[in-house]
Amino acid sequence: MTDAAIKDEVRRQLAVMREGAVDFYGENELAARLTVCLKEDRPLRVKLGMDPSSSDLHLGHSVVLMKLRRFLELGHTPIFLVGDFTARIGDPSGRNKTRPALDADQVKEHAKTYVDQVAKLLDVSAVEVRFNGEWMDQMTPGDFVRLCSQATVARMLERDDFSKRYASEVPIFIHEFLYPFVQGHDSVALAADVELGG
């Protein structure tokens, strides 16, 4: 592929990726990664993680699953991550109070249905399905402390959900601070180029 053809393809794919998006963070970085992938003739690795905090996905999940399907249609590698480890922590995102953590048995029961439900919108044979317990359950306490040493409390409080709760004097528990570290480590473990959320 010529440089001009690569530029055109990057523009085309970015337009497809932007369709229906409310927020599109890191577009310049994504364009650079996509350019490298096209030059190397390899797909982007696109991660979508969902915690099995209930037994069923809901209608809102279909929007981001359809976006994952668009990446597949563009020739990229979709990764559907079942957050079996993170569900045991409880996702604080967008919450004004602590989300209850689930025990391992509840998570296992809920996770059973997720892949079947995703298969209604995606060809799961073309999707890399993973569980973050694969690597997080193997991590030693020392490994986890080293991971957490990569950020400060001040930086964590910059997150909208935490800053609002802190300003309102709503408790933020330590395990909730750990959740974003696990999310970030998931992306590293999966060598994800793109992370979808919503």
Identify the residue ranges that each predicted region occupies.
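NTP-dependent nucleotidyl-transfer catalytic core
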Residues: 1-198
